[in-house]
Amino acid sequence: MSQDPYTPPPLPKPFTNTTPPPTLLTQGAEAHLYKTIHLNTNTPAALKIRPSKPYRHPILDRRLTRQRILQEARCLVKLVREGVNVPAVLALDWEGQGGENGNGGAWLLMEWIEGLVVRVVFERWEAFIKASGGSLGEKELRREEEKVRGLMRGIGGVVGGLHKAGVIHGDLTTSNLILRTGDVDIKDGESPAMVGDVVLIDFGLAGQSSSEEDRAVDLYVLERAFGSTHPQAEKFFEEVLEGYKDSYKGAAVTLKRLQDVRMRGRKRSMIG
């Protein structure tokens, strides 16, 4: 039985006649991400659309969607002000008109971050290490490991800045980190460059919090992501924590709480 082709929700009015039209990059349960053009500056931009949920009551739908898009935008604005590497907010709007028949969708236009998703960087590096088949000399291997350590410290640094600003990401994975690098078109089988600024993206689950528990859980989610997605790089995760300590003075308390979160995670794994 064939499935009907997916039809994304209609684009917001400001983007219905742009040239070129917005390009759909990803689609999730909560949002769709497009690459488009910022009309005022004619530069690339990221457009995140939170479509209306037809199964929700229209009033509740509009209220929740508006609340979530505003929360995401406020976190980004605060982080930009604090000097953390995140996309700048360019514009946003929500559709709250029309009574019970109104659309509850909302959209957020952000700075386009050029670079490689960190998940892809690590995947290419692990593929390079595997393809080398142990043929790397001691100096080459040490150089490769130093590259990974440097990137890990950069990740820890940007997460430390995030927490210092009083924001929790809520979904820290290597898919939500971008490395600003000119080495985008590297060929398969080559070792990727790991030099550049690390930028945090996708703040759909973010919120403002000063809770050490929330910060520790953020770090734990990132640690688990490395364990499940990048097993060869996982052994360097302590470098993330070193970078975190360098950029956030309150790190000692958070890292102590991280030990508790790890223990609870292990107990849940044992119980199943």
From Swiss-Prot:
<feature type="binding site">
    <location>
        <position position="48"/>
    </location>
    <ligand>
        <name>ATP</name>
    </ligand>
</feature>
<keyword id="KW-0547">Nucleotide-binding</keyword>
<dbReference type="GO" id="GO:0016787">
    <property type="term" value="F:hydrolase activity"/>
</dbReference>
<dbReference type="GO" id="GO:0005524">
    <property type="term" value="F:ATP binding"/>
</dbReference>
<keyword id="KW-0723">Serine/threonine-protein kinase</keyword>
<dbReference type="InterPro" id="IPR022495">
    <property type="entry name" value="Bud32"/>
</dbReference>
<dbReference type="GO" id="GO:0070525">
    <property type="term" value="P:tRNA threonylcarbamoyladenosine metabolic process"/>
</dbReference>
<feature type="domain" description="Protein kinase">
    <location>
        <begin position="19"/>
        <end position="272"/>
    </location>
</feature>
<keyword id="KW-0067">ATP-binding</keyword>
<protein>
    <recommendedName>
        <fullName>EKC/KEOPS complex subunit bud32</fullName>
        <ecNumber>3.6.-.-</ecNumber>
        <ecNumber>2.7.11.1</ecNumber>
    </recommendedName>
</protein>
<dbReference type="GO" id="GO:0004674">
    <property type="term" value="F:protein serine/threonine kinase activity"/>
</dbReference>
<dbReference type="InterPro" id="IPR000719">
    <property type="entry name" value="Prot_kinase_dom"/>
</dbReference>
<keyword id="KW-0378">Hydrolase</keyword>
<keyword id="KW-0418">Kinase</keyword>
<dbReference type="GO" id="GO:0005634">
    <property type="term" value="C:nucleus"/>
</dbReference>
<feature type="binding site">
    <location>
        <begin position="25"/>
        <end position="33"/>
    </location>
    <ligand>
        <name>ATP</name>
    </ligand>
</feature>
<dbReference type="InterPro" id="IPR011009">
    <property type="entry name" value="Kinase-like_dom_sf"/>
</dbReference>
<dbReference type="InterPro" id="IPR008266">
    <property type="entry name" value="Tyr_kinase_AS"/>
</dbReference>
<keyword id="KW-0819">tRNA processing</keyword>
<keyword id="KW-0808">Transferase</keyword>
<comment type="similarity">
    <text>Belongs to the protein kinase superfamily. BUD32 family.</text>
</comment>
<keyword id="KW-0158">Chromosome</keyword>
<keyword id="KW-0804">Transcription</keyword>
<keyword id="KW-0963">Cytoplasm</keyword>
<dbReference type="Pfam" id="PF06293">
    <property type="entry name" value="Kdo"/>
</dbReference>
<keyword id="KW-0597">Phosphoprotein</keyword>
<feature type="active site" description="Proton acceptor">
    <location>
        <position position="171"/>
    </location>
</feature>
<keyword id="KW-0779">Telomere</keyword>
<dbReference type="GO" id="GO:0008033">
    <property type="term" value="P:tRNA processing"/>
</dbReference>
<dbReference type="GO" id="GO:0000408">
    <property type="term" value="C:EKC/KEOPS complex"/>
</dbReference>
<keyword id="KW-0539">Nucleus</keyword>
<comment type="function">
    <text>Component of the EKC/KEOPS complex that is required for the formation of a threonylcarbamoyl group on adenosine at position 37 (t(6)A37) in tRNAs that read codons beginning with adenine. The complex is probably involved in the transfer of the threonylcarbamoyl moiety of threonylcarbamoyl-AMP (TC-AMP) to the N6 group of A37. BUD32 has ATPase activity in the context of the EKC/KEOPS complex and likely plays a supporting role to the catalytic subunit KAE1. The EKC/KEOPS complex also promotes both telomere uncapping and telomere elongation.</text>
</comment>
<dbReference type="GO" id="GO:0000781">
    <property type="term" value="C:chromosome, telomeric region"/>
</dbReference>
<comment type="subunit">
    <text>Component of the EKC/KEOPS complex composed of at least bud32, cgi121, gon7, kae1 and pcc1; the whole complex dimerizes.</text>
</comment>
<dbReference type="GO" id="GO:0106310">
    <property type="term" value="F:protein serine kinase activity"/>
</dbReference>
<feature type="region of interest" description="Disordered">
    <location>
        <begin position="1"/>
        <end position="22"/>
    </location>
</feature>
<dbReference type="GO" id="GO:0005829">
    <property type="term" value="C:cytosol"/>
</dbReference>
<keyword id="KW-0805">Transcription regulation</keyword>
<keyword id="KW-0010">Activator</keyword>
